[in-house]
Amino acid sequence: LSMNSGGSSQIPTIYLEDSARDQIAAIATLTTESEYGEVAGLIGTFNIEVERKQVDAFNVVSLMKGSDPELANEVIVYSAHYDHLGVGRDGNIYNGADDNASGSSALIEIAEAFAEGSAPPRSILILHVSGEEKGLLGSRWFVEHNPLPEQMKLVADINLDMIGRNNPTQIGITPSPEHEHWSSLNEAAADACEEEGLEPTYDVDSFYGRTDSYNFAKQGIPAIFLFAGVHEDYHRVSDESDKINFTKAAAVSRVAFRLGWHLAWAKQPPVRKSPNSETGNR
């Protein structure tokens, strides 16, 4: 039996493991699955003690100002959340190697790559956000209280979350060509994938609203989410670094760098397009 706060929900949620379910069913003299599977109107009463603690969390932001006097006011954002689940009741630490040390470390590598060269025309912002696991809180605060100078405009977000597992030659991309938020940003991402020998897949739209890029998209900012998919260690203490495919994570990082570099030099910032099923078959 475990209790979860339900992310940003204020309603505690109870999850019953099979063993707990069977014990409750046995108390009700229901001894087989066929019996308790047919019962209607069985009511259970639970007393739950919830201790809430409010803490301060911080976004970490770094900005490389663009070299063009006008285009420098157009900002390409790289985002990744650095928070995870902390310490469990049993004292085990949820290190979150894939979720999301993989994405947050990729941002550090991308920042170093940009720093090694001359600044591109548009500005580059590296955004490590907190509070993702509690309901995308850090990214929501950032887009609602944009701390940049007033003249600077966010024109794209490239979000990396869980990029180090599953198929070594594929990376999930959302929004897909059939999604209402499909944009020229996604087309450029497909080209970057080809340059790095990765196949983009478009079967992860169900996760579009579950990561930080969604808060940018809600503000009308073209956004893309690079995501290798969930696995058996998702939100478990077993999500450790020895299971990361570092070669794949590095390739996805290079895809993201190429994409941002292209956007920073493009004549026009990315724009949303109508869903295009033909592009999805590329």
What are these model-derived regions, one by one?
Residues 87-94, 168-171, 236-239:
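Short acidic, glycine/proline-rich loop/turn micro-motifs
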Residues 2-4, 9-29, 119, 129-231:
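Metal-dependent peptidase/peptidase-like ectodomains
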Residues 2-96, 112, 116, 121, ...:
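Soluble metallo-hydrolase cores and metallopeptidase-like ectodomains found primarily
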